[in-house]
């Protein structure tokens, strides 16, 4: 292969790379404008990115602070932050991508809640399929045993304080989360997150970004999860 052909191929690859970067950047700008408009409609504040102080809060959660797992430290890219504080409940939404994954389809929609009405053990609810659950249980790693058939077939609960987390999960909550099995949930103290997780092992079908047309409905469901796990005011 001649030097001329090699240089041509390098140039072509460079041009295509720049083209796709431009398209991706333009798409992100358009998506951010739509989120900004949506925030105004819902009485929330919009910011394109998240500050470092809030990022530190997220390390309280298993999802963002598990150094031994490939899904840990997913704080590389955070976009489209919507925020409000009503009746002492701080609520945020943001999109978060795995470290090194860029954006595009690889962003999780995450709802964050902070309130004095929350007093949670450090727990993590992860969506699993029944075969994975059975495999883990055979090695004694099946997590907290929850007496709810539908929930136990779909979810793995990890928490060091098993009695507290069992008391926390009412039958109504377990029924609700089982029928809306696109959610994972993490809690710790006065904070919690409700999100659609992505896993490299293929254990969930929640690959892709939230459709803005379904945002209000998904937010309502996330708020309902928060209410199930909060103490009466």
Positions of the model-derived regions?
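Charged, low-complexity intrinsically disordered regions
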Residues: 32-50, 56-233
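Feature marks short, highly hydrophobic, charge-poor N-terminal signal-anchor/signal peptide-like helices
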Residues: 1-9
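Alpha-helical membrane-embedded segments
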Residues: 8-16
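Transmembrane-cytosolic junction motif
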Residues: 15-40
């Amino acid at each position: 292969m001649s030097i001329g052909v090699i240089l041509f191929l390098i140039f072509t690859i460079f041009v295509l790379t720049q083209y796709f970067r431009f398209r991706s950047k333009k798409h992100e700008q358009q998506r951010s404008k739509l989120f900004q408009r949506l925030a105004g409609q819902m009485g929330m504040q919009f910011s394109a990115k998240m500050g470092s102080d809030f990022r530190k809060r997220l390390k309280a959660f298993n999802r963002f602070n598990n150094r031994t797992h490939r899904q840990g430290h997913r704080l590389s890219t955070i976009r489209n932050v919507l925020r409000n504080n009503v009746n002492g409940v701080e609520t945020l939404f943001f999109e978060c991508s795995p470290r090194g994954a860029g954006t595009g389809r690889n962003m999780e929609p995450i709802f964050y809640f902070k309130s004095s009405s929350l007093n949670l053990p450090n727990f993590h609810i992860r969506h699993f399929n029944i075969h994975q659950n059975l495999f883990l249980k055979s090695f004694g790693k099946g997590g907290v045993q929850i007496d709810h058939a539908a929930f136990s077939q779909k979810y793995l609960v990890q928490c060091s304080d098993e009695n507290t987390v069992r008391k926390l999960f009412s039958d109504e909550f377990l029924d609700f989360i089982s029928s809306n099995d696109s959610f994972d949930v993490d809690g710790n103290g006065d904070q919690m997150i409700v999100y659609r997780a992505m896993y490299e092992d293929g254990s969930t079908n929640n690959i892709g970004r939230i459709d803005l047309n379904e945002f209000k409905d998904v937010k309502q469901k996330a708020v309902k999860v928060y209410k199930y796990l909060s103490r009466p005011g």
